[in-house]
Structure formats: C-alpha cells, structure tokens
C-alpha cells in the first residue's frame, strides 16, 4: 500500500514543483512594479506557503507525537491532540486582530519578520519537546505567529494597484493550497527518518525565510499612513455581533459556522482515526492527506465552475451538502480501506458548499462591507476550529475505549447529524442564490 502511495505521490510532487515554480516565477516576472516589489511579493507568497506547511505537517505525526509525550492510548492521544489544535486556533483567533493592528501602527516588515522568527524558534522547541505542556506552549506561540496572515494580505494590498489586487489575492489562495498539500506530505515522509524531523525542516524553512526577508522585503506602509494602536480595534466579537444583526446575513453565517465545525473532524481526527482502524503509519497518513488536498483542489478549481454553469449556485450547494452527509455517514460506518477511498470522493465534493454560502453572504451587503463580512466569516471559522477539536476528540476517546461501545467513526456521525440539521436552513438560502 505504501509503495503504491509513494509512486503516486512522486508523480504529484513533480506537478506541485512545477506549480510552485510557476507561482514564484510569475510573482517575479509579471507584476508591473519594480524588481524589489516583485521580490517582496514572492516573499509574502513563500511566507504564507510556509505557514500552511507548518499547519499541515503536524497532522500526520500527531499520533506518534502524542505517544512520545506519554499518551497511553489512541483515544487519550487524540484528546491531547485536540487540546493542541484548539490552543493553536484559539491563539490565532485572539491574536489575528492584534497582529493586524500592530502592523498598522508600526509597519508590516517588523511584524512579519518577528512572527517568522518566533515560528522558527517554536519549531525547534517542538522538536525538542518531550513533555505535553511544552508542546502546548509551542502550539500557542505557533498560533500567535500564524496570525500574520492578516499582515501578509495587508502588505499585498499596500504594494498592489486596485486592478491587480484580486489576481494577487488569488495567488495567495494558490500559495496556501500548495502549502496544505506539501505540509502533510513533508510531515509523513520526514517522520520516516525521525518523529522530530518535520519540525527541524519547518524550522530551517522559517529561518531561511527570515534571512530572505531581511534583504528583499521593503516596508510597504509609509509612516504618514500609519495609525495608533487602539485596543478597541482588536475585539473580534464586536464585528460578529454586528454582522448577525444585518438583515439576511444571519442564516448564511450560521450555515458556514456549522459546516466549518462539522468539517473540522477531518483534520482533527484523520490521523488517529486511520491509525485506530487500519494501523497506518505517519507516512501513509501524510500521503493520504496530501492526496485529499489535491482532490479538494480539483473540486474547487475544476468541478465547481462546471457545476455553477450547468446547474446554478443553489443546486451546487445542494450537491455539496448531500455529499457532506454521505461522506460523514460513510466515514462513521466504514471498516475497509476500499470503503474509505470511495467515501473520500463524497467528502471532497462536500467542499462545493462553503464557497456558495460565502457568495450568498457577500450578496447581502454593500461593497464597503465586504471586508467586514469576510473577516467575520474567518472569525467564525476560527471559533469552530477552537471548539471542534475539544468536542470531537472527546467523543473519539469515549468510543474507542475498550470498556464501552467501540465506534471510532462516532465523531463523523455527529458531524453528519449537524449537516442533517442544517438542511432546513440551507433550503431557506434559495432566495440568496443567483442561478
């Protein structure tokens, strides 16, 4: 099984190398700005890709990592892993507006480079950790450093003309996508050498990027355009409450939150679930996650435009919701690798739904509120990413306990129930759709 996956992965990796080269080469050659700004743009893309790699490389090695710090069973390891993931998401949620406001006050470059330096140090700490509390502190600092996404995107806005911003933000998505595919693959393959190898690799990448940034990254925010740091600007709940009071926006936001919460079962439990059912190694887990990432990219970039053109937004949303329901129920009941592969197709198709709901939410507000709505959506996703790991891993631990009912897929069934409860709300979104 591993040999087959490795062969398939090598082919995909060649394609990803080409994509990575194309992304970076385009950032150097095609932007209508001077060479320094082009190199700065490339630096931002690399930074975001490293952030995504850092998130993804932890997933496949999580079971082994929990064993290393003293977890006595797969269930206990999953619970501890859930705490780590929740701590990362919590730090990200709290510090994202703080980091963004600091960059508005003191400039983008110092904030970005300091965060990257913290991330490099954090990876070294994670590599050396033999106690759970050290890993916990490390994940919190990783979440703080990972909050630089807002600063990175602000930097791109600073150096891009209005007509080029959309295309460049699209490249941000491409950089994140490449990172999320490479991260699990690097984690799984490097773990074959040693459980700490992925962290050392990530530390070297982050440190090298800091040095790169020192030389090629100019400050993009002129002193005259900066504004003082105000604590009133860093409360994410103010914007969330305001968004829910906007007519027609509450239902799409509820749907997105529930969908994000249910979908978190995949990154949170995939490694523990496949280890428990099939005794997969970190390598196999990492390659499976990378393959799933490629499958998601195919759905988003290939199938989604086809579905929208053929059946419209609302039908595409329905297909995604139905696929999500089938996927969650399937994962809750499967017992074979063949079944897992079949269900994985439906899980990937479920990714049709969030963009449709997001578009419907965006259609409910004026142009000057689009940034606010997207920020609220990101905040709700962060809240889901904080709550879901704690709940899902707790359920998993209960249902893999030898003294109770053995059902490793129970968290997936819970996600399926949530999606089923969401269906009446989704059907009310028809009036928001543009067919």
Residue map of PLM features:
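Cytoplasmic helix-loop-helix junction between adjacent transmembrane helices
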Residues: 138-177
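Multi-pass alpha-helical transporter architecture, strongest
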Residues: 210-216, 413-435
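A membrane-interface helix-boundary motif in multi-pass transporters
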Residues: 191-204, 394-417
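C-terminal transmembrane helical hairpin of 12-TM major facilitator-type secondary transporters
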Residues: 314-357
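Short amphipathic helix-loop junctions that connect adjacent transmembrane helices
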Residues: 61-78, 268-285
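Juxtamembrane intracellular "pre-TM" segments in multi-pass secondary transporters
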Residues: 218-255
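Conserved MFS/SLC helix-loop-helix module at the cytosolic interface between two early adjacent transmembrane helices
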Residues: 93-130
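Central cavity-lining transmembrane alpha-helices of secondary-active solute carriers
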Residues: 83-99, 290-303
């Amino acid at each position: 099984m591993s040999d087959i996956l490795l062969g398939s992965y090598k082919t995909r990796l060649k394609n990803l190398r080409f994509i990575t080269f194309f992304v970076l080469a385009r950032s150097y050659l095609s932007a209508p700005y001077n060479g320094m700004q082009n190199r700065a743009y490339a630096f931002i893309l690399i930074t975001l890709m490293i952030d995504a790699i850092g998130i993804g490389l932890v997933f496949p090695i999580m079971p082994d990592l929990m064993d290393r710090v003293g977890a006595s069973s797969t269930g206990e390891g999953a619970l501890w892993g859930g705490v780590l993931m929740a701590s990362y998401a919590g730090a990200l949620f709290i510090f994202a507006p703080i980091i963004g406001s600091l960059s508005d006050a003191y400039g983008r470059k110092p904030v970005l480079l300091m965060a990257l330096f913290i991330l490099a140090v954090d990876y070294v700490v994670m590599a050396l950790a033999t106690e759970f509390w050290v890993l916990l502190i490390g994940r919190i600092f990783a979440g703080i450093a990972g909050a630089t996404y807002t600063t990175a995107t602000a930097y791109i806005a600073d150096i891009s003309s209005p007509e080029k911003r959309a295309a460049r933000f699209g490249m941000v998505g491409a950089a994140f996508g490449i990172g999320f595919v490479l991260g699990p693959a690097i984690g799984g393959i490097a773990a074959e050498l040693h459980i700490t190898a992925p962290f050392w690799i990530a530390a070297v990448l982050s440190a090298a990027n800091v040095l790169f940034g020192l030389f090629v990254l100019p400050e993009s925010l002129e002193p005259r355009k900066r504004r003082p740091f105000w604590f009133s600007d860093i409360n994410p709940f103010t914007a969330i409450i305001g968004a829910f009071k906007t007519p027609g926006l509450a239902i799409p936001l509820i749907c997105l939150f529930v969908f994000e919460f249910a979908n978190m079962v995949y990154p949170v439990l995939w490694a523990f679930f496949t280890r428990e059912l099939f005794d997969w190694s970190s390598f196999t887990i990492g390659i499976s996650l990378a393959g799933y990432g490629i499958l998601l990219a195919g759905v988003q970039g290939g199938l989604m435009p086809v579905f929208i053109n053929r059946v419209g937004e609302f039908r595409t949303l329905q297909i995604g919701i139905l696929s999500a329901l089938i996927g969650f129920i399937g994962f809750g009941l499967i017992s074979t690798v063949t079944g897992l592969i079949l269900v994985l197709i439906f899980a990937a198709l479920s990714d049709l739904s969030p963009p449709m709901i997001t578009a419907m939410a965006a259609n409910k507000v004026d142009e000057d509120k689009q940034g606010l709505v997207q920020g609220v959506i990101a905040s709700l996703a962060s809240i889901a990413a904080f709550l879901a790991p704690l709940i899902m891993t707790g359920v998993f631990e209960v249902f893999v306990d030898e003294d109770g009912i053995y059902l490793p897929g129970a968290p997936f069934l819970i996600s399926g129930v949530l999606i089923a409860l969401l269906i009446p709300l989704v059907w009310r979104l028809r009036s928001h759709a543009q067919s």
